[in-house]
Amino acid sequence: MKRDFTFFCRIWIGIPFFSGLVNGFSMSPPTLDNTKDQLVINANDTLNITCRGQRILDWSWPEESLSKVEFTDRQGQQSPTDTPGYREIRLKECQGVAGKPYCKILILTNAQANDSGYYRCFYKDIKAVIDGTTAASIFVFVRDPEHPFIKRGDNDMETIFITDSETHIEVPCLVSDPDLKVTLFSLVPYPEPVDGSVVTWNNKKGWSIPRHIIQNTSTFIGFYCSISVQNSQHTSSIYVVQVIGLKFYEFKLFPEDSPVELMQGESLVLNCTALVDFNTGVDFQWDYPGKKENRLASLQPLRNVLDEATEISSILSIRNIHLDDSGYYTCWANTLEMKRELTTVVIVHEKPFISLDYRNGSVIEAKEGQKSVRLSVKVSAYPSPEIQWYKNGKLISSKNSSRFKVQQHSLQIRDVCKQDAGEYMLVLKNSPAALEKRLNFTLIVNVPPQIHEKEAAPPTNLYGKGTRQILTCTADGSPPASISWQWRPWSPCDLERTRRALRRRGGRDQSPFCHNWMDLDPEHAVNPIESIDTLTQMVDGKEKTVGRVVIQNASVPAMYKCLAENRVGKDERLIYFYVTTIPEGFDIEMEPSEDPLEQDLVQLKCNADNFTYENLRWYRLDPQTVPPELDCKSLHQYATFLEGQLSFQTTSNNWVLQLNITNIQLQDEGNYVCEVQNRRTGVKHCHRKYIPVKAMEAPRYRHNPTNHTVNVSESLQMNCDVEGTPFPQLSWFKDNQPLHQISGILLQDSNRTLSIQRVREEDAGLYTCSACNQKGCVQSSATVSVIGSDDKTNVEIVILIGTGVIAIFFWVLLLVIFCNVKRVNPADIKTGYLSIIMDPGEVPLEEQCEYLPYDSSQWEISRDRLRLGKVLGHGAFGKVIEASIFGHDKKSSANTVAVKMLKEGATASEHKALMSELKILIHIGNHLNVVNLLGACTKPNGPLMVIVEYCKYGNLSNFLRAKREFFLPYRDRSPKTQSQVRRMIEAGQASQSEHQPSTSSTNPPRVTVDDLWKTPLTIEDLICYSFQVARGMEFLASRKCIHRDLAARNILLSENNVVKICDFGLARDIYKDPDYVRKGNARLPLKWMAPESIFDKVYTSQSDVWSFGVLLWEIFSLGASPYPGIQIDEDFCKRLKDGTRMRAPDNASPEIYGIMLACWQGEPRERPTFPALVEILGDLLQENSLPEIPFNVSQSSEDDGFSQASSRPPSQEEIRLACNTLPTRYYNCVPFAGCVMVGPSSTCHSRVKTFEELPMEMTSHKTQHDSQTDSGMVLASDELERFEHKHRGAMLTTATTGQSTDRLISCPSVSSSGSGGGLLRPVFFTQLSGQTFYNNEYGHLSEEGVSDYFSSSDQAV
């Protein structure tokens, strides 16, 4: 999806090639001098293995007790120590070869039996060790007749733990000789040999035993192995099998809302519930304020055995609660393997009360078109009072207007309009206690004009030639705006005049300067105009002016502009109308079927737009030699050229290269690639098509027809159950004579079923079914015997006629009743949706989705227009598939999209969840910088499909890591590029309109640009990515959505350097619960979470701002993992809360690092908003697009961080961020962004501690069988919850104190005029070393599918 006011960061000539073929450069794995999978040596021999590769190498070996000694050729080989029993592994550097410059030799002298095992050579600087990709291994057997078994310890008995779900048991009887014959014995309780036909032996792993062997006996004890070597019997350790239950599915403390508030004298009931696996014992312990004083409390245990787990509870009850009972109530659940705890706060009030005060003053100002305005108050009350809002003396109800939202104790008005101005009053009542409080507000509304399509529609679109198109501009203003239309021929705009206009207008123009505009006249239009209309419509409850131009026949590219103007101001929208016959310019069609059969004729057509491409060629990839990742440039090394028939379609101006495969065979199955060349750039692009071939199979009977004996006048049905490929043609014979369908004899289901409605005597005989296809024929016969006579009594006929008349009468009666039943009016349903979704406090958001309307005329796409491709990713209950979408005639070119659908066997609830996600995406609307909804397939004749945008370059994190070697801080900037960047910034900053959902479900076409893989990455690109993410988050925040997982892995990169935010379906409506508390344990990305989210489970738009700061760190570290080398434990969380922050990445300027620190403010209200971040990053992006400033130019001492070119006074947000734009780079003492505004000047905390300043202690936390920590990235569940409760306890018992830091630098005062030294380009330091971090950013805190935490999988896209 594109936006009409956006010029992309980098426009290069060319079209990106198919992403399924290119994923970056490939890397070959290391190679060993011994290419076999195993090596056998004798005891006391010397093991010598040489490894070569493309990167720095290292070795691993099975015997961990052996020490490692490394030396090079220059150091010489030192002799091993003479200490008896001392052995070591020696690693020696050696000379590399061409293509593999690194070499390392492993030397082990005096090898022993216990040295048997895998010896693995791997790339040292890559964390993922995978054989065949980043590593190479060989299994070495050290043959020792005296020690045939390998023992790693001194234990003669080992325990094998298994769970109920495991089907096999692995008994690790490892041997030192691969040719030994090992016998497996089971102790039941006496030794018995195990039947060798049911077990499997692997000389590298041991025995694999089916689970049922130990389930069939009650006296089973364990296993052991035996070997006879040189007339000597040897036995292994005894392996005892233990079945245990370890899973801790869920742990909750009810009520879940914290704090729990009560009135003195009421009863307190807390329920601590654990959902665990069978055979798991749980011991509950409670701690509460009155426990030490022996406060009378009752504990009631409960145990409930469910179908798949056991629910165990402990209920704490305290009657007649006192004020002294206020405090922390903690429940511990202990098992043999783990310990869980939950804490809630109980507050006991003495009497009812209401305390009320203003939060932001009594006078509130807003602008027309502003996304929302909030009337907020500070309220402290118990019990919860009744809330009433009045406007001009009239009660406000969310049922009367969907734009008014009462959330807790605040009133939010969305889509502010001039009618919202007036006097507002809040009334809080507690009728039983006779308490009432009131506050009055005054709302002032200012009105600017807006064109809404600028936020929802792309500026450039591809229009099919010969199609009817409608250009629309919707404007609102006060007074109503008038709309006029202009056009100009398709040609570049005047760049020089654009630059002068930008400077003259202060860098705030909304569109490029283009001259030669002419009024649009239907009589003299280059594209025939059907009509030009201007009308007034009610849109979202507001009166708006809509201008439409209906183009009867799109034939010539042109540029159109609509202008909306009133006496307050004006706005304009520029539309690039590009006409083409193939929207993508390049696609592949396969006829006549996507699933051909053996011996079919298959036609592959490669269609390419003649305006863009030439030199079409067909290739077939060799499946034996093609690498996993293939560049189009290296295609010829792994493919065979195929001759095709080239033709030119004059009417559509397209080239068609047709490849005919006659009489296709099984060996013809595979990947076929069409290669084309861009006419302007010469770059070659490829599309790949996989042809599956189904083998033909001869007909065969699954069940032969059976003999039948029936009475006269009864019905008879015979089935011919056959199968084959292709499906056979079926024929029936009676007494060797062909049988055809006549009255009373029916042949149904492609002749599979023969039905005789009323059997007669002459129907007896031999019936034969014959099935034939290209592979042959089969036939089978059955005898039908008829009993009785054809004579029928009149009584039977009368009964049949009477029964038919009665049945007809009842059917007519039911039809009349059904037609008179009152049906629900769809308009009533829509009204209900509008009232419910605006008050989710009464109905959960998930239930609201049932009322959300789905307009099939707008969003429904026929499944025939989709062609599914490869799977891009899997989710909890669904999958994402790459697909192509065609036009209505299925002959036009296809666009690439991503399709989200359910897996096979999905339940009704999963189907409902995907349908709810579809409706939520429709409700959120479209934006350039989010992954947008394109359409859906919901009709019942196929699977449910949700169609979204496809982003070919994958997620931003992987892209940045792959581009590290091609990172250049700066590059030459052409005037055209600088102008485009300026226009993009100004279009984003000047736009203040509400983001409206698009009414079009068509896929956005691709614009011709160079491949991003082939262009260098610059600082300007990094700032551009940051700017776009801020704009996308600004849009989501305007739709009242909180992301909660904003990270580079959830940012996708599309063509033209456009980034799109994904996984925002995980967000929740902010009005459902402002202090959103996640239920149960979940996967927590702690490195990206704000302190209030970690400690208090509070998620707001300001917590997303914190995550945005971490995302900035990722971008300017080129995809590095945040907090590198820091263990994520309790100490980390404590220091994060105390103000310790990450230091600046090497590629970040002081301005960028200042923005990071501002986003990491401990107090959420002090963090910048996303609109402010869009403004600031837009200015930085514009400055970085200017010509280079030499590195030796330094800032003056009077530089306050603001550009002199700006004629406006600095905003409060910019003044606060200016404190961080110091030219000096600090490492352990960095500038701190926490500025405090005092009159016209500002003061700052002068110093902030970073994680490098105070080394983190690398402590080890024992979490047996927890499976919740992953490479130190998150806390284990028990440690996290224990630390949260400790944090809450500290908050109640001690007053919060600010962190003391030494003042090193004073922040310069900022005058109200905002003048100061101009910003100079900062000196950036060396780029990152190229190390790739593969740490998993999550840790499992619950079993998948058990927690009620809503999750979405979406595109791998």
UniProtKB/Swiss-Prot annotation:
Question: Which EC number applies?
Answer: 2.7.10.1
User: Residues on the Extracellular side?
Assistant: 25-796
Annotated Ig-like C2-type domain ranges read 25-121, 138-244, 255-343, 352-442, 453-583, 583-690, 699-785
Name where it mostly resides. Answer: membrane
Question: What positions does the record give for glycosylation?
Answer: N44, N48, N114, N216, N271, N360, N400, N440, N553, N610, N660, N707, N711, N751
What Pfam families does this protein map onto? I-set (PF07679), ig (PF00047), Ig_VEGFR-1-like_5th (PF22971), PK_Tyr_Ser-Thr (PF07714), VEGFR-1-like_Ig-like (PF21339), VEGFR-2_TMD (PF17988), VEGFR1-3_N_Ig-like (PF22854)
Segment forming the signal sequence: 1-24
Free-text description of this protein's post-translational modifications in UniProt: Autophosphorylated on tyrosine residues upon ligand binding. Autophosphorylation occurs in trans, i.e. one subunit of the dimeric receptor phosphorylates tyrosine residues on the other subunit.
Q: Name one GO molecular function term.
A: vascular endothelial growth factor receptor activity
Q: How does it sit in the membrane?
A: Single-pass type I membrane protein
Activity regulation: the record says: Present in an inactive conformation in the absence of bound ligand. Binding of vegfc or vegfd leads to dimerization and activation by autophosphorylation on tyrosine residues.
Reaction(s) catalysed by this chain, per the record, are: L-tyrosyl-[protein] + ATP = O-phospho-L-tyrosyl-[protein] + ADP + H(+)
Q: Which domain of life is it from?
A: Eukaryota
Q: Give the CDD domains listed for this entry.
A: Ig, IgI_VEGFR
Which residues are the active-site ones? D1045
Q: Which GO terms describe its biological process?
A: angiogenesis; atrioventricular canal development; cardiac muscle tissue regeneration; cell migration; lymph vessel development; lymph vessel morphogenesis; lymphangiogenesis; lymphatic endothelial cell differentiation
Q: Which UniProt keywords apply?
A: Angiogenesis, ATP-binding, Cell membrane, Cytoplasm, Developmental protein, Differentiation, Disulfide bond, Glycoprotein, Immunoglobulin domain, Kinase, Membrane, Nucleotide-binding, Nucleus, Phosphoprotein, Receptor, Repeat, Signal, Transferase, Transmembrane, Transmembrane helix, Tyrosine-protein kinase
InterPro entries reported for this sequence? Ig-like_dom (IPR007110), Ig-like_dom_sf (IPR036179), Ig-like_fold (IPR013783), Ig_I-set (IPR013098), Ig_sub (IPR003599), Ig_sub2 (IPR003598), Immunoglobulin_dom (IPR013151), Kinase-like_dom_sf (IPR011009)
Q: What is known of its domains?
A: The first and second Ig-like C2-type (immunoglobulin-like) domains are sufficient for VEGFC binding. The fourth and fifth Ig-like C2-type (immunoglobulin-like) domains are sufficient for homodimerization. The fifth and seventh Ig-like C2-type (immunoglobulin-like) domains are required for autophosphorylation and further activation.
Q: Which family does it belong to?
A: Belongs to the protein kinase superfamily. Tyr protein kinase family. CSF-1/PDGF receptor subfamily.
What is annotated about its quaternary structure and interactions? Interacts with vegfc and vegfd. Monomer in the absence of bound vegfc or vegfd. Homodimer in the presence of bound vegfc or vegfd.
This protein's name: Vascular endothelial growth factor receptor 3
Please report the organism this UniProt entry assigns to the protein: Danio rerio
